[in-house]
């Protein structure tokens, strides 16, 4: 009887620790960063080191430029200079 109670207790303890890992459906990662506004001016190309696009789960599509100083600047992906910088960074 003691063995059965111990085994059941251990099983419940393991289930309690594992449950939070399975609470979200697979493939439903929340967005890590979203932009709520865009920069109002064009960045100097020499300051931009890299870029990434925000998640499709964000309410506003954006391109985030990473600068030499480590800043992250949100830009409108439909702006011509933004698409030009993205193409340039892809080639280099």
Swiss-Prot record:
Position of the signal peptide = 1-23
Give this protein's Gene Ontology molecular function annotations.
chemokine activity
Disulfide bond annotation, renumbered to this chain = 34-58, 35-74
Which SUPFAM superfamilies does the annotation name? Interleukin 8-like chemokines
Keyword vocabulary terms for this entry: Chemotaxis, Cytokine, Disulfide bond, Inflammatory response, Secreted, Signal
Any GO CC annotation of this UniProt entry: extracellular space
- Specify whether Signal is a keyword of the entry: yes
The record's subcellular locations are:
Secreted
Tagged with keyword Nucleotidyltransferase: no
Principal localization reads: secreted
Q: Which family does the UniProt entry place this protein in?
A: Belongs to the intercrine beta (chemokine CC) family.
Q: What is known about what this protein does?
A: Monokine with inflammatory and chemokinetic properties.
UniProt name for this protein: C-C motif chemokine 4
UniProt organism field: Mus musculus (Mouse)
Provide the organism lineage as a comma list: Eukaryota, Metazoa, Chordata, Craniata, Vertebrata
């Amino acid at each position: 009887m003691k063995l059965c109670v111990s085994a059941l207790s251990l099983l419940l303890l393991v289930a309690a620790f594992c449950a939070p890992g399975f609470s979200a459906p697979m493939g439903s990662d929340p967005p890590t960063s979203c932009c709520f506004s865009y920069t109002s001016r064009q960045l100097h190309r020499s300051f931009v080191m890299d870029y990434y696009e925000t998640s499709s789960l964000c309410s506003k599509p954006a391109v985030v430029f990473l600068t030499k100083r480590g800043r992250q600047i949100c830009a409108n992906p439909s702006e011509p200079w933004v698409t030009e910088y993205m193409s340039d960074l892809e080639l280099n």
